[in-house]
């Protein structure tokens, strides 16, 4: 197995990639992005349920002709990179196996996102490979690019946390967030391919409804990462997070209502966000409210900060399958391999 050396791909040799779990929405998109990436070679795609089928039969729009196989870690040879698109719990053993083979890994599940093991166990159950937690890097490049560059295991963020953290990070870093209410809305693809009755056409069409308004698994992820960048003694005292399912296939909007610790003007608020994101190629600061359609099929996040009547309000939109999952995985992988982070996703 090839050892992790940087940069891979810049000498003309493509990094060889396996996508494990390529039949879900995020896994299939990841496979397509790798397939079309100039510095990556997609050598294998796997499925736990649809082996023997070519991916382009399940997703004709992607045009990936490789046949889905059953994952056989012992049989992998000369593979540099693993992208794991398994559900939480099922992903960790696969990640551990790939790391044992010397592969660098981007994991799309929640298994390595949380630093605090008891918090993980509270929301997801027992962890099969907790020893890997300390070496995992949270893969939000706009938050911790330097750590991503040096990482060998990336915990790709959740879709809601990606949008919410990007929306709120400048305020958190300034120690300004006292209390925040996050009203989030996501397309149906965010629930995954096997969503069941709750995400069926009959249920979601012409309908908007909250789900898991208390105890949603993404709340501790958002809170942990924002408090990690907050000054000592100026963490977030209270957070309410309520997601909603809206009748669109993909896209995500978060509206964040922030009680700030000290008054701030609109000019100062915009300057705070410009100082934080002015050099970020995938973050666009807006003067008008953004919509889901503005970022569909892109790795972009559009943000509008506003001083409202009683609170600071921050809107952010992403494509939940792209920046919220698969294209962010490629952004992370580009950085890990010493490539320009926009290759294959710009």
What are these model-derived regions, one by one?
Residues 254-346:
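C-terminal active-site/capping subdomain that shapes the small-molecule cofactor and substrate pocket
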Residues 25, 135, 159-166, 213-221, ...:
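Conserved active-site and cofactor/substrate-binding residues in soluble primary-metabolism enzymes
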Residues 210-214, 246-247, 291-295:
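Short Gly/Pro-enriched turn/cap motifs at secondary-structure boundaries
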């Amino acid at each position: 197995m090839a050892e992790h050396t940087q940069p891979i791909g810049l000498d003309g040799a493509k990094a060889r990639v396996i996508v494990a779990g390529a039949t879900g929405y995020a896994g299939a998109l990841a496979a397509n992005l790798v397939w079309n990436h100039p510095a990556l070679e997609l050598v294998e795609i796997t499925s736990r349920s649809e082996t023997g089928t070519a991916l382009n039969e399940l997703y004709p729009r992607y045009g990936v002709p490789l046949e889905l196989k059953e994952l056989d870690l012992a049989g992998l040879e000369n593979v540099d990179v693993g992208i794991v698109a398994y559900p939480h719990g099922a992903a960790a053993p696969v990640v551990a196996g790939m790391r044992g083979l010397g592969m660098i890994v981007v994991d799309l599940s929640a298994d390595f996102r949380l630093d605090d093991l008891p918090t993980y166990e509270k929301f997801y159950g027992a962890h099969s490979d907790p020893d890997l937690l300390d070496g995992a890097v949270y893969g939000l490049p706009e938050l911790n690019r330097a750590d991503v560059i040096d990482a060998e295991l990336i915990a790709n963020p959740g879709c809601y946390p990606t949008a919410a953290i990007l929306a709120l990070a400048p305020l958190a870093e300034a120690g300004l967030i006292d209390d925040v209410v996050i009203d989030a809305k996501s397309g149906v693809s965010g629930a995954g391919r096997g969503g069941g009755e709750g995400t069926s056409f009959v249920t979601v069409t012409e309908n908007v409804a909250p789900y898991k308004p208390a105890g949603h698994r993404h709340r501790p992820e958002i809170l942990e990462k924002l408090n990690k960048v907050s000054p000592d003694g100026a963490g977030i005292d209270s957070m309410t997070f309520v997601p909603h399912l809206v009748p669109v296939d993909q896209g995500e909007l978060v509206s964040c209502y922030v009680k700030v610790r000290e008054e701030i003007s609109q000019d100062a608020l915009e300057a705070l966000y410009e100082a934080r994101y002015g050099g970020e190629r995938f973050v666009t600061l807006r003067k008008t409210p953004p919509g889901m359609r503005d970022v569909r099929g892109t790795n972009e996040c559009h943000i509008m900060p506003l001083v409202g009547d009683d609170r600071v309000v921050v809107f952010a939109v992403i494509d939940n399958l792209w920046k919220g999952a698969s294209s962010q995985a490629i952004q992370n992988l580009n950085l890990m391999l010493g490539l320009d982070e926009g290759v294959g996703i710009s």
